[in-house]
């Protein structure tokens, strides 16, 4: 493993933590604005990464999808993971703000990721690609911004998919409940224990290309051309 690989891994870890931890904090923060104190009282609105780390989603999944393939010399362009879900008392949110509030909570993390992706793209477009003459600080900064852009786009796209247990499914559930269509929410609730299986199937089969890779490339084209 070369020095540039070490820089890339460090930048990727920091960018991933910023993306996944901020994603969860935003869910809790919006819920807090609608009177749900659960996340705040449990200390989950803190930026301390240790309280947000999920052993599977924050460590094992990134290792499987990015770091191990990279160390083996394979393509390392797909980094995915998640933080420990922030506890939210949805009934409190709905009682205080209705289903619109619940939908806002569902989308809060995605909005955060899209904001960071847009912000990163603006910075990236103002930078020139590093050369051997550039300092280590500049090289690290460029790689970090690039990773921050890629990771946040990946997270936004994945969470928009209607996968049981993920934000897209939660949004659809609350949207249909608002119009008293109960069957959809019941389906997603019953299917939630199988959401992880769906994720694994998407990651290890050709389904990843139309469901994830194409949307990711579309968003990246819109942001940086």
Describe each region flagged by the PLM.
Residues 1-225:
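Hydrophobic transmembrane alpha-helices and their immediate loop junctions
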């Amino acid at each position: 493993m070369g020095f540039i690989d070490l820089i890339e891994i460090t930048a990727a870890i920091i960018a991933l933590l910023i993306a996944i931890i901020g994603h969860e904090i935003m869910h809790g923060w919006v819920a807090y604005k609608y009177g749900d104190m659960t996340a705040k009282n449990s200390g989950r609105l803190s930026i301390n990464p240790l309280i947000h780390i999920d052993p599977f989603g924050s460590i094992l999944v990134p290792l499987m999808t990015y770091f191990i393939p990279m160390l083996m010399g394979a393509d390392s362009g797909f980094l995915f993971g998640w933080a420990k879900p922030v506890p939210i008392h949805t009934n409190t949110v709905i009682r205080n703000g209705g289903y619109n509030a619940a939908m806002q909570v569902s989308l809060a993390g995605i909005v955060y990721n899209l904001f960071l992706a847009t912000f990163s793209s603006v910075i990236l477009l103002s930078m020139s690609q590093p050369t051997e003459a550039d300092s280590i600080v500049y090289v690290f900064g460029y790689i970090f911004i690039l990773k921050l852009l890629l990771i946040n786009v990946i997270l936004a796209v994945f969470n928009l998919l209607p996968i049981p247990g993920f934000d897209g499914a939660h949004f659809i559930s609350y949207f249909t409940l608002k119009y008293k269509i109960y069957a959809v929410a019941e389906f997603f609730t019953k299917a939630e224990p199988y959401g992880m299986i769906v994720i694994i199937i998407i990651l290890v089969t050709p389904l990843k290309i139309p469901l994830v890779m194409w949307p990711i490339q579309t968003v990246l084209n819109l942001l940086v051309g």
